[in-house]
Amino acid sequence: MALLKITLLFAVTAITEIVGCYLPWLVIKQGKSLWLLVPAALSLAIFAWLLTLHPTAAGRTYAAYGGMYVVVALIWLHFVEGVGLTRFDFLGATMALAGMAIIALQPISHS
């Protein structure tokens, strides 16, 4: 259960970061309304708060989170931006998740 909870927390954290960065990208690259910067800032604030909910040291959390970020970014690429994924995308995502698992599931030393 703990693994599922951590994985979901990583996924939600990644979504808030991607939304917080994608909306300004729309403003800058596609000339969308400046009002998109308001939900972008809110999303990034939620992202920062979510990072505090992870159960391990900040650096380790960021390292493990990176693997989930890669996967969520590729899902975003496919479903939001409409770009097809390649076998290299799938291979890279698999490797990133493996790295995340190694970091996140390591035995914790309390010394």
Curated annotation (Swiss-Prot):
Pfam families: UPF0060. Keywords: Cell inner membrane, Cell membrane, Membrane, Transmembrane, Transmembrane helix. One of its GO terms (cellular component) is plasma membrane. It is a multi-pass membrane protein. PANTHER family: UPF0060 MEMBRANE PROTEIN YNFA. This is UPF0060 membrane protein HCH_03337. It comes from the Bacteria. Belongs to the UPF0060 family.
